[in-house]
A protein has these predicted regions:
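His/Asp/Glu-rich metal-coordinating catalytic cores
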Residues: 1-55, 60, 64, 71-252, ...
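Conserved acidic residues
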Residues: 52, 203, 335, 362, ...
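A polyampholytic, Gly/Pro-enriched intrinsically disordered region
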Residues: 100-105, 292-305, 387, 469-495
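Short, surface-exposed amphipathic charged segments that create phosphate/polyanion-binding patches used
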Residues: 150-154, 287-295, 415, 465-475
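Short, compositionally biased "basic patch" segments
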Residues: 191-206, 293-300, 370-396
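Hard-cation-handling environments
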Residues: 229-374, 386-387, 422, 437-439, ...
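Generic long, charged, amphipathic alpha-helical segments
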Residues: 387-418
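Charged, amphipathic alpha-helical linkers/stalks
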Residues: 458-521
Length: 535
């Protein structure tokens, strides 16, 4: 079999690995690159129509965000994921498509005034819906056959609702080799989700390393800290505005807010209102509430058995329309506002910041990672003014963080996961980590007796009975340009064109033996298209 590392190698986003084994060609994840780009992802080396199926570890866009593009360019196979992941992808991929369409529309409005060529969205809502129709839901712990000689099992890894490690048994000839893809390994003792499950055996392991260089430290008292922030803000007559990731973090905050209200930890403010002002967060919350209780941890299941909704909070109000959102800030009653995006780069949260940042009685509470260059990072680093909707806003609100909240295991958690194998795997491939972090974690694994390496994007390895052999090292050269719009987007769009060309060749081959009249018409259409673009 052959393994090609296409994305999230020596960087964190854009996860994608291609396997060619037992006569099949398939992907583990197909994610979108986000934030700062260090090493450019490799384009698919084959046409999307030549991919037989995809396995998805979890619903985050950096693991799934290019699936609509894959469908647009001719992929028609099945996409296997756990049932909660299928549900979450149904809303997250559509939301991603809306963002792509909105950004293209905005650029075209500006471009028309400058006489620029129209910009096409990376993909559309129709592409997202086409991808969603290809999903097949799979239960945890159920071993399934994907093709002759290929079996898989999804194991709960505690990172996000539906997240999984994937066990693969691949039989070629008389030899069966077991691969394990860790997915994103969850943190221990987090609300709602189970702790990561451990796997007993593997020949080769592909594991993430996001926090492979650090220790989270003791778990903070989230409920106590949050209650203190609410108390002092409400006593001042202000709002607590929480920029929050729509899927996962918003539901954790609802869990904590329910506990605060049940225990009466905020005094003198009665049943203070809590607003969810994010359509995506609202849909995600519904999915959490409708999910099989077996997906949750023991404490959450115990609440459900008592008839208690773990994320159902008295005083919770759902903001659906834009008018609903605007009305929130006309009411001066102290309140909690949960809104996306979590890094304040887009979405309704920016309107709430405009209305609350300048008020010294209010608090802006960050509960997740803030990437360099984002508005959220600017605020926590002490900016005195920021610009929102073209208007300078003075930062007079209290800015604070609820630290220690992470959906990723730290170094010790990663070691605990990999050391659970009863015998050491023949090799551990370290992926999904920043450049230096991957190198540090490879050294850590080596010190613990593992054979480990950190491949680069484009690396190829052959795995057989004799072991694993590196066929190609991949690209070690860092990108000159860091983020988003330039080299990476251009390469992605050009790859769409290449894929379209490969698809055209397949269509030509399928028409062999057709009526001469039809073939002549087809040839004329192709030549006319070539004449238009051969410039």
């Amino acid at each position: 079999m052959k393994i090609t590392f296409l994305g999230a190698n020596h960087e964190v986003t854009g996860s994608c690995t291609m396997l060619e084994a037992a006569g099949q060609r398939f992907l583990i994840d197909h994610g979108m690159e986000q934030g700062k780009d260090v090493y450019e992802n490799e384009p698919l080396p084959v046409a999307p129509g030549e991919i037989d199926f995809v396995l998805v570890t979890h619903a985050h866009i950096d693991h799934t965000g290019l699936l609509p593009l894959l469908a647009h360019n001719g992929f028609r196979g099945r996409i296997y994921a756990t049932t909660p992941t299928v549900e979450l992808c149904g809303i997250m991929l559509r939301d991603s498509a809306h963002i792509q369409e909105f950004e293209a529309e905005w650029k075209n409005r500006k471009g028309r005034r400058a006489g620029a060529e129209p910009v096409e969205p990376l993909y559309t809502i129709q592409d997202a819906e086409a991808a969603c129709r290809l999903f097949v839901g799979v239960a945890y712990e159920k071993r399934i056959q994907l093709a002759p000689g290929i079996e898989a099992r999804f194991v709960d890894v505690g990172h996000l609702l539906g997240s999984a490690s994937i066990e693969l048994w691949i039989t070629e000839g008389s030899t069966t080799t077991k691969l394990v893809f860790s997915g994103d390994i969850g943190n221990h003792d987090q609300p709602i989700l189970k702790d990561p499950a451990y796997i007993q055996q593997a020949d080769y392991v592909f594991m993430e390393s996001t926090y492979g260089d650090r220790i989270h430290g003791p778990r903070p008292d989230y409920v106590g800290e949050l209650a203190k922030i609410l108390q002092r803000t409400f006593d001042r007559g202000g709002n607590v505005v929480i920029p929050s990731f729509a899927v996962g973090r918003t539901q954790e905050m609802l869990y904590f807010l329910r506990e605060i209200k049940e225990q009466g930890l905020v005094r003198g403010h009665g049943n203070f209102p809590i607003y969810i002002d994010s359509p995506l967060a609202t849909e995600a919350t519904r999915i959490f509430q409708d999910t099989d209780p077996d997906c949750f941890d023991e404490q959450t299941r115990a609440l459900l058995e008592k008839g208690i909704d773990p994320i159902g909070v008295p005083g919770l109000r759902i903001s659906v329309t834009s008018d609903d959102s605007r009305m929130i800030n006309t009411d001066r009653v102290p309140k909690v506002i949960l809104s996306a995006s979590g890094m304040c780069e887009a979405g309704r949260i920016r309107h709430h910041l405009k209305h609350n940042l300048w008020r010294p009685e209010c608090t802006i509470l960050f509960v997740g990672f803030q990437a360099v260059g984002t508005l959220g990072r600017t605020l926590i680093e002490g900016a005195e003014t920021v610009k929102l909707f073209g208007e300078p806003i003075e930062v007079r609100a209290e800015i604070c963080q609820l630290t220690g909240m992470s959906g990723h295991a730290d170094r010790d958690g990663l070691l605990q996961w990999v050391e659970a194998f009863t015998e050491k795997p023949r090799r551990v491939f370290v992926i999904h980590g920043e450049d230096e972090v991957e190198n540090i974690f490879v050294n850590t694994l080596t010190e613990h007796g593992f054979t480990a390496c950190a491949p680069y994007n484009g690396a190829q390895w052959a795995i057989g009975a004799e072991g694993a052999v590196c066929l190609q090292e991949g690209t070690k050269v860092r990108m000159e340009q860091r983020a988003g719009e330039g080299t990476n987007r251009a390469a992605t769009v050009f790859q769409r064109l290449v894929s379209a060309g490969k698809r055209l060749l397949r269509v030509i081959e399928h028409n062999e033996g057709g009526a001469n009249k039809d073939l002549a018409k087809f040839a004329d259409q192709i030549n006319a298209l070539c004449d238009k673009w051969d410039r």
